[in-house]
A protein has these predicted regions:
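Hydrophobic/aromatic-rich core segments of domains that either
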Residues: 65-149
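Acidic low-complexity segments
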Residues: 1-57
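Short alpha-helical patches at coil-to-helix transitions and adjacent helical residues
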Residues: 7, 27, 60-65, 97
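Glutamate identity and glutamate-enriched acidic tracts
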Residues: 6-8, 15, 59, 101, ...
């Protein structure tokens, strides 16, 4: 993943934002900004952050990579993570998804700029880096869906 944090386009986006007083407010503003910069395009392969910005659209990995880039350019450690999350789309199901973790106040906080979530909902299930990478590759060659076969409650 190439993070163009020094890109003129990224710097312009950050300069156009109000300057939040705390890391928590900055994270919320960055989630909203990343969400507003792109329109979701379901079947578009993930590309570079700058390509997604130029097109004005992207899929979840593009939203997540844009957030990672903006956060790092603003001085916050951030990373893109992969897993599964429940989508209420045309065919509600758990699907492959990308979102972010950002370090604030000594703790990693999950955020989802695709769905404009400053706090992740309970359906985000992070996968290991190896499994996440394998699912990312598989999602480009075929549709990846998970089906709940059984559920139980405490």
């Amino acid at each position: 993943l190439r993070i163009p944090a020094e890109s003129e386009k990224i710097i312009r986006i950050l300069e156009s934002m109000d300057k939040p007083a705390s890391d928590s407010a900055l994270i919320a503003a960055l989630v909203t900004t990343a969400h507003q910069q792109l329109t979701y395009a379901d079947n578009q392969p993930a590309g570079s952050v700058l390509t997604a910005l130029a097109l004005g659209q992207g899929e979840c990995t593009d939203f997540a990579d844009l957030f990672t880039t903006l956060a790092r350019a603003a001085g916050l450690p951030a990373r893109t993570v992969f897993g599964i999350a429940y989508s209420n789309g045309d065919q509600p199901s758990f699907m492959f998804h990308a979102w972010n973790e950002v370090l604030a106040n000594g703790q990693w906080q999950g955020v989802d700029p695709t769905w404009n979530q400053v706090r992740l909902d309970a359906t985000h299930i992070k996968l290991s880096d190896d499994l996440g990478a394998a699912l990312l590759f598989a999602s480009y060659t075929k549709e990846v869906r998970l089906k709940v076969l059984e559920q139980s409650y405490f």
